Regions:
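Tandem repeat scaffolds
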Residues: 1-128
Length: 128
């Protein structure tokens, strides 16, 4: 199956079990519930996630850059499956009013990122 491309689209209440080989550019995800979803070979470039709840999501060979996370809840997410993480290409552009529980951000070079409007519980930030 060929790679799917989405530009400027809005996805409301999407709850995939598996998402593979898709590129999302400047898309908006609203009220999306990703519970145990497996996300492979996908790109999220300049996307906004608003009032989304993710739990046990696994990223493999994925890329995220300049994503806005607004009023979201993330539980048990290992963000390490995102490729292209560096001081120059940040996965997150903004995070406001988000709750992170049991997340792992290891090796993501997030020292300059402002998470001050978010809450955290039992998260790991090794080598950030």
């Amino acid at each position: 199956m060929a790679k799917q491309y989405y530009q400027g689209e809005t996805f409301d209440n999407v709850a995939p079990d598996f998402l593979h080989d898709a590129e999302f550019n400047d898309c908006t995800f609203i009220n999306c519930r990703w519970n145990g979803a497996r996300i492979t070979a996908c790109s999220f470039l300049g996307c906004t996630f608003d009032r989304c709840a993710w739990s046990d999501v696994v990223f493999s060979f994925c890329q995220m850059s300049d994503a806005w996370l607004l009023h979201c809840a993330f539980r048990s997410i290992a963000w390490g499956g995102l490729q292209g993480r560096s001081a120059l290409v940040q996965p997150f552009g903004r995070a406001e009013q988000c709750e992170f529980r049991y997340n792992e951000f290891s090796g993501m070079a997030l020292k300059q990122f402002d998470f001050s409007k978010c809450s955290f519980g039992d998260c790991v930030f090794d080598d950030c």
